[in-house]
């Protein structure tokens, strides 16, 4: 899937393989391998490509059809009110969460 997305994005941006390879700092043959799916692009190159095209890495990999790289923002206060929160497999009880909530309240109150 990534090979098709990379080809589609490159053509949409009117770039040759050589131009794109130069932009991301690799040989044309390496980039050609990505589009031919004979080579897998390393994560750092996927991130560079995603930024270059203003899409998400998930989009390039075919994990989503939404190219928008927006980060979903979550309200931590709402999250900490949920009844079933875990940290590294360990359930966080109200006794653990209450001091965390208090610290966050103090920190945010001092910054306002």
Curated annotation (Swiss-Prot):
Residues 6-60 form the HTH cro/C1-type domain. Keywords: DNA-binding, Transcription, Transcription regulation. Pfam families: HTH_3 (PF01381). InterPro entries: Cro/C1-type_HTH, Lambda_DNA-bd_dom_sf. Gene3D superfamilies: lambda repressor-like DNA-binding domains. Residues 17-36 bind DNA. One of its GO terms (biological process) is regulation of DNA-templated transcription. One of its GO terms (molecular function) is DNA-binding transcription factor activity. This is Uncharacterized HTH-type transcriptional regulator YobD. The gene is yobD.
């Amino acid at each position: 899937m990534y090979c098709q997305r990379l080809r589609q994005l490159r053509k949409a941006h009117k770039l040759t393989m050589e131009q794109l390879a130069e932009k991301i700092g690799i040989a044309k043959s390496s980039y050609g391998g990505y589009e031919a799916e004979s080579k897998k692009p390393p994560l750092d190159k996927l991130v560079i490509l995603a930024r270059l095209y203003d899409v998400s890495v998930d989009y390039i990999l075919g994990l989503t059809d939404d190219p928008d790289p927006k980060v979903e923002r979550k309200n931590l206060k709402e999250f900490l009110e949920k009844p079933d929160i875990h940290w590294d497999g360990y359930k966080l009880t109200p006794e653990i969460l209450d001091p965390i909530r208090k610290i966050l309240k103090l920190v945010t109150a001092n910054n306002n």
